[in-house]
Amino acid sequence: MYFWRGYYFGKEGIWCQDFDKEEAFCVLKDSLYKDYMVRAVADNGKTIAVSRNIGTNEPLLMVDVDKKTIKNTISNHTFIYPCLDREGSKVFSVTKSDIYKNIYGNPFCVDAETGKVIATLDEKTQWGNTAYHPESNSVYFSAFKQPNLYKFNFDTLAFSAVSTDKKIRIFDCKVACDNKGYYYLGSNILVYMNNEDEEVWRINFKEKEKLSGKTLFSICLSDNPDYIAVYLLDGNWLFIVNRNDFSYKKYKLGRVGFSEFFNNSLLFIYKNDNFSTLNLETLEEKPFLPTAGAIL
């Protein structure tokens, strides 16, 4: 299931494409929400969080996907890389940082119904991405360009630190599609950890590719258990890594907004909300549109 903002079938709004079904459907089609974007999706697929802007204290709207209605609005918080718990009842977020003014915030969790803060990490720094782990109902998150990785459990509301390689300045972290582990990336090194927070393997791209002056900064994981994709900071190259033997293919990419895998392809979202897919076996790229039928 994939959510996006766009103009399709004569309607602009928040759309959903369930890849197990033939039809896309519009979750929010009112013109009032044309500038809103999807910020987080509950693991059960029944709740999404949307807002107008990233990095401001704009209200976060909690949307019931089945009923296509807004069930609650959370105000007075700045949500950066928010994550929803399994049922969409709690929202975790790192906070906005201004490194030039030495202003940093505390990661926190709020009750999605009341908007009340129910957990806070007493540590302030510049925070990186978040990654939801469905099996443990937890969130992994990193301190940006630092060797620090943390875990927040939605059930216990407890924070914990994860032991990592202190020589790696972390850019990104992602949970494996099979929920058997997770990845973190930094200093041009990709590390795979199991659910016991133990390192299983790593790939040092700097040694293999001589990435002088370039930085790998983002990970994208496939529903197919064989593939990982890693981006260069300048957006020009994509490395498609085979999890089984650590071999990889390179693809001349060009800059994209963001992307994710589905089936055996990588779905790109370019500027102006144009879609395309890249086949991981053939490296064939072609335009992508939702199915011809739609439920408005």
For each feature predicted by the language model, list its residue ranges:
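Short loop/turn segments that connect beta-strands within beta-propeller blades
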Residues: 18-22, 64-68, 111-115, 153-157, ...
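Blade-level signature of beta-propeller repeat domains, shared across WD40, Kelch, NHL, RCC1
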Residues: 260-296
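Solenoidal tandem-repeat scaffolds enriched in leucines and small polar residues
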Residues: 94-108, 119-134, 139-150, 154
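Loop/turn-rich, solvent-exposed surfaces of beta-rich toroidal or solenoidal domains
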Residues: 213-236
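A short loop-to-beta-strand structural motif that recurs across blades of beta-propeller domains
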Residues: 13-15, 59-61, 106-108, 148-150, ...
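Beta-strand C-termini and the immediately following turn/loop, strongest in propeller blades
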Residues: 2-8, 28, 41, 49-55, ...
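Repeated scaffold domains used in trafficking and secretory/extracellular systems
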Residues: 34-41, 77-86, 125-133, 168-178, ...
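A short beta-strand motif characteristic of beta-propeller blades
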Residues: 23-30, 69-74, 116-121, 158-165, ...
